[in-house]
Amino acid sequence: MLGPIGHLAALAAYGFRRGAQVRHDLDAHRELAWAQAGVAELPRGLEIQWLGTAGFRLSYQGQHLLIDPYLTRLPLGDLLRRRVVRADAARLAALPDPIAILVGHTHFDHALDVPALAARAGCPVYGSRSLAHLMALHDHAERAVVVEPHHPYELGPFTVTFIPSKHAKLAGGLWVPYGGELTCEHVDALTPQAYKCGQVWGLHIAVAGVTIYHQGSCDLIEDALVHRGVDVLLCGISGRRFTARYVNRLLRALAPKLVVPHHFDDFFRPLDAPLTMNLNVNLAGFVDEVGAVSREFAVRTLGLGEAVGGPP
């Protein structure tokens, strides 16, 4: 794995080839489109929707589960100016009321919209102590469930287990930006930088006879991954270059039948803007990395806001 200087050099090289790389990634995204695969990989009645970034909606039997929903998508300028950003209720209106919301960690691109969604739906949210603190800031402390590792939570038709995980060290491979616990003392101080990472969780979900694993950040604790042979791996890929052998280790631990990459989009652009790629995410390269582990792993992509389901 590269050191800090190597990462800086790689970023500089990306700057020169960015246009070509983005086009290559968009081509790969189109070629791997799940809707064009012609294979019904989900059971009847189960639907998966990508909400952009690491966000997903899972629906079964008329009940909905949200994972890391982030539709507000603040502009980059708001991050740089450290502006307090509120959840965009108009954008959140596109989502159905969930029975629960699951949060893998509390960076803004995973947690900013959660209090507003939970308040609207009157549903519980499951995650870390940092998430509970965030909910308390919004006067919804009673809706927060601080989870226990490896404990199965029965949420309607879904059985959810939280798996201890780690966040990629995006700062040149040295540290996690905005790491530590979320300790902000007032909602008026909730700048993007105030959304500290908190405890990181992977999510194992069983529903309709299939298993789904959501990996929201590009690092892992291999000894914690006890669910081998999952049906669908929702695999975050942004920042994986900062974690040694991330793809290899994750795939060998989980042995998924299907891999669905996410967290490769530029999440500073609104959801209704054309898809473009996050900084140096290299989606096409990810496909090669999966193939290097085994050609038996199928890779499928979803478009922003796209939903796929089992046979009618």
Protein language model features and the residues they cover:
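Active-site neighborhood of phospho(di)ester-bond hydrolases with catalytic His/Asp-centered motifs
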Residues: I67-Y70, D97-H107, Y126-R129, Y213-C218, ...
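Short, conserved loop/helix-junction motifs that constitute active-site signature segments
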Residues: A94-P96, L117-A121, V226-G229, L250-A255
